[in-house]
């Protein structure tokens, strides 16, 4: 299987250290989507770390925004950064991302000789939601074909699609920030296609698509994480939101994240954490922004992962 996939891959060494990197293209002739980057440690793999970027976030984008991939591979993890659907040019109304992710995980575990029982998945923004949703479906289905993560994390992901619809509607209505106006208009268009219309028209569609839904019993899909270690990172800088977006706590992903962790604790999850990263979010160019991967501390993350997976 690995020989076949590597026919369509590029292999090179990462600058500055000896680990190899491969980009595996799963569809012949398509270098735009359905591919993933693999960072390979120079030792026997200690485990698998899957990191999913945000909306339109390629593997290159992820590696520019956070040192987590290189920190993890230096610590002995095999790191996979997938780009399975090109969000910029398509609308994933059939959740093709989930289907492809379910097949990618066993593929890389087999191809790169990774321990099957040492697997953490996570991501930033939409990538964090996708990681949460994947984990929920894995534990919900109880299907051996869906590899179950030992833990899941998200860096400021939106979890409740109904709340996100309301946020976009508000930002469009107040007409304050040009960036917010453009994003809100485009995302509302996508939501209408993906879910059929608004949450009031199709509440069930929004519940099914959300990785946390406070209107549903036990948080909706979140209930499937009641026994899974969960970390949700957030830079809850309300003053930045007020000054730059004229938003409120209700428009922040922090609302979803704190609610989800509280719900998991109500369900008995003793390993559900809301990680506050106030003031730590920055763009790669150094511009302050509380919605960026940089809020996560890579070194501390690896200490957490090693302890969780009992890796020395």
Which ranges hold each PLM region?
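Bacterial Sec-dependent N-terminal signal peptides
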Residues: 1-20
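N-terminal cap/lid segment of alpha/beta-hydrolase-fold proteins
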Residues: 18-43
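Short substrate-entry loop that stabilizes the transition state in hydrolases
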Residues: 44-46, 51-90, 242
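Alpha/beta-hydrolase active-site loop
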Residues: 92-113, 133
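Primarily recognizes the serine-hydrolase "nucleophile elbow" in alpha/beta-hydrolase
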Residues: 110-111, 116-175
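The alpha/beta-hydrolase serine catalytic core
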Residues: 166-214
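Serine-hydrolase catalytic core
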Residues: 193-273
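Catalytic active-site module of serine/aspartate enzymes centered on a nucleophile-bearing elbow/loop
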Residues: 287-312
């Amino acid at each position: 299987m690995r020989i076949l996939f590597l026919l369509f891959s590029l292999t090179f060494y990462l600058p500055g250290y000896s680990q190899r990197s491969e980009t595996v293209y799963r569809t012949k002739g398509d270098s735009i989507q359905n591919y993933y980057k693999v960072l390979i440690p120079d030792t026997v793999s200690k485990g698998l770390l899957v990191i999913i970027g945000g909306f339109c976030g390629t593997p290159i984008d992820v590696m520019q925004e956070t040192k987590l991939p290189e920190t993890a591979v230096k610590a002995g993890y095999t790191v996979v950064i997938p780009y399975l659907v090109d969000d910029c040019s398509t609308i994933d109304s059939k959740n093709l991302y989930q289907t492809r992710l379910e097949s990618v995980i066993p593929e890389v575990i087999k191809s790169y000789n990774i321990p099957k029982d040492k697997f953490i998945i996570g991501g930033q923004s939409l990538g964090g939601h996708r990681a949460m949703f994947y984990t929920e479906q894995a534990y919900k289905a109880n299907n051996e074909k869906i590899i179950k993560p030992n833990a899941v994390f998200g860096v400021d992901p939106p979890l409740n699609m109904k709340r996100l619809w309301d946020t976009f509607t508000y930002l469009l209505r107040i007409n304050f920030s040009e960036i917010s106006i453009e994003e809100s208009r485009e995302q509302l268009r996508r939501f209408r296609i993906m879910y059929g219309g608004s949450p009031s028209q199709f509440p069930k569609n929004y519940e099914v698509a959300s990785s946390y839904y406070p209107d549903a019993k036990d948080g909706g899909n979140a209930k499937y994480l009641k026994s899974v270690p969960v970390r949700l990172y957030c830079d809850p800088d309300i003053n930045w939101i007020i000054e730059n977006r004229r938003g409120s706590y209700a428009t922040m992903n922090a609302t979803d994240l704190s609610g989800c962790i509280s719900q998991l604790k109500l369900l008995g999850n003793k390993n559900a954490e809301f990680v506050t990263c106030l003031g730590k979010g920055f763009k790669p160019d150094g511009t302050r922004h509380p919605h960026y991967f940089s809020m996560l501390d890579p070194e501390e993350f690896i200490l957490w992962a090693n302890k969780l997976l009992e890796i020395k």
